[in-house]
Amino acid sequence: MSEMRRMLSFVRRAVDDYDMIEDGDRIAVGISGGKDSLTLLEVLSEMRIFYPKKYEIVAITVDMGFEGSDYSEVAEFCRRLGVKYVIEKTDIAKIIFDVRKESNPCSLCAKMRRGSLHSAAQEAGCNKVALGHHFDDAVETFMMNMFFEGRLGCFSPKSYLSNRKLGLIRPLLYATEKDVQYFTNKRKLPVVTSLCPEDHATERENMKKLLAQLEKDNKGLRHRIFHAMCKANIDGFKEK
């Protein structure tokens, strides 16, 4: 099976299981420039050809304002796919690192990026936003919430922001990070290196390492955690 067919099978199954796409949807795909968002963009673009429900996609990048940011290869990639590309310019980096000098910037940064993405999606006439969270992101988020916040929870596969009138969908839910990395390498996607000084210095990276260590002695651990989340209907996850 080709890498595209394999990834399409993951995405279509998630989209169908959670009714993520309806006829006439105009979907903003959040593009950070990383492997996850670029994979999602190419697969959703390809799926437009045959999916029974007709939809449009718009690619949106929130430019945080780091000096040296260059999304020209992403723009060319979108042109080849026939997808409109919007770069939302912001001063998020300056606000967080220069003005507020945040010691723990990740939470505020994520909140500000989400706000900018949602605003840009509305301006582009979109009714949904597709995010590139995959299988491993879901497991890591669930474990982080349990370890650091003492609660059982995760992001939802599909949700609705009533204040924005925007749906949020995560079509890569069934694809592992390994699947995404393989797809990225085979398709030679134009990944943009993150310029954030806090990149890889996060609780998520620590949880990723912990799960990798636990998996060595407990094969299939991530899949069992994911299955437990579905069985318990954590935040909209469903057993299939």
Per-region residue spans from a language model:
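ATP-dependent adenylation/nucleotidyltransferase module used to activate substrates
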Residues: 1-140, 148, 178-186
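Generic structural signal for well-ordered, non-membrane alpha-helical segments
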Residues: 4, 110, 200-203, 207, ...
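Solvent-exposed amphipathic alpha-helical surface segments
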Residues: 18, 47, 51, 214-217, ...
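Catalytic subdomain that performs nucleotidyl-dependent activation
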Residues: 57, 136-216
